[in-house]
Amino acid sequence: MKTNREWILRRRPEGPCVVDDFEYRESELEHPALEPGHILVHNSVFLCAPTLRNWMDAPSNSLYPSIDLGAPVLATTAGRVLESTDDRFPVGSRVTMIGHWQEYDVVNSAVWPVRAVPEGQDLIEAMGPMGMNALTAYFGVTAVGRPLAGETMLVSGAAGSTGSVAAQIGRILGCRVVGIAGGPEKCDWLINELGLDAAIDYRAGNLVEQIHTTCPNGVDVFFDNVGGEILQAAVENINKFGRIVLCGQIAGYNESRPVQGPTNMMRFVYGSVRMQGFLLGDYEDELPRARTEMAMWIKEGRLKHREDVRTGFENIPTIYGEIFAGSNDGTLLIVTDEDAYATT
């Protein structure tokens, strides 16, 4: 009999989540015969994504899931299939999925997204440069923002896992790309390593003025991971027929009250500006094409990615908190066993 390790949500976080919001639990792995469309997975990699913090809140009308108190924490995970009643994911295959902070996980693949990992790719790569955040950036830019060569594209959270990929795709498509990040070190990385045209340190002064100075011809596409004051500053600089891509609102994830949205709404009306949110799941049928194109860009050296890989199932809550402190460098992943590095 296997022992299943898991982290459950003990209480609703108030502000940034802390270790005491969670409880470690071990139990004997017992489950009845799998129902049709279910898989049993041994998880080896856990993605620290900011949106998990939303799921820890009480149910609301925001359309995202709410984790029940006493239930395992929802998360994006990667692992190997041990049992299956879904022909798409046979025993021995590897998958990424919406699972839980559990070592062993039973998932209904008809309800939660499950994606096969191709041979030749380890689980780190599947969760990093070809993972959920990177693919989200791809569709946010190409399907929602739709930048044209020569346009100016502004990206908030540009040094983060999703923002850094979005910014590079903008460059690949021929845009002048400006990234917003916190601190000179991250701004230098955006310019010197990723090849962005300019970077703005949002801590270094009036952001509306900084955007105006750095984007003298205005902003055509704004890829937003942050919301709040940064979104407002971008709206003040958006061009006619501009597009605002709402990918995340990390400025408000730890707030007890909703962060105020844009106030200059008539600029949207008179500027024919479009603001749109989206989910990766909206483009499920287009994933093969996206993976092929991104793999080509990576091979050509046009798309770079960095992963911040940590270890230890017991450390998951502590490591997860770093995503909001900005102390991670790249996509923050937690590896719990060596199967994470297998390519078959």
Residue spans for each PLM region:
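Glycine-rich phosphate-binding loop and adjacent beta-alpha segment
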Residues: E229-L303, D337-T344
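Glycine-rich beta-strand-centered segment in the early N-terminal region that forms part
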Residues: E30-C48, M56-W101
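Short, glycine/polar-rich helix-capping loops at beta-to-alpha or helix-loop-helix junctions
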Residues: Q102-E103, G182-L190, L207, V259-M265
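C-terminal capping/lid region of NAD(P)-dependent oxidoreductase domains
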Residues: K2-N4, R302-V309, P317-T344
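NAD(P)H dinucleotide-binding glycine-rich loop of Rossmann-like/cofactor-binding domains
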Residues: V73-R80, R88-G157, R302
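Mid-domain Rossmann-like dinucleotide-binding core that forms the NAD(H)/NADP(H) cofactor-binding site
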Residues: M127-G205
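Short amphipathic alpha-helix with an adjacent loop that forms part of the alpha/beta core around
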Residues: N206-P216
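N-terminal Rossmann-like NAD(P) cofactor-binding module of classical short-chain dehydrogenase/reductase
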Residues: T96, L154, I200, F222-F223
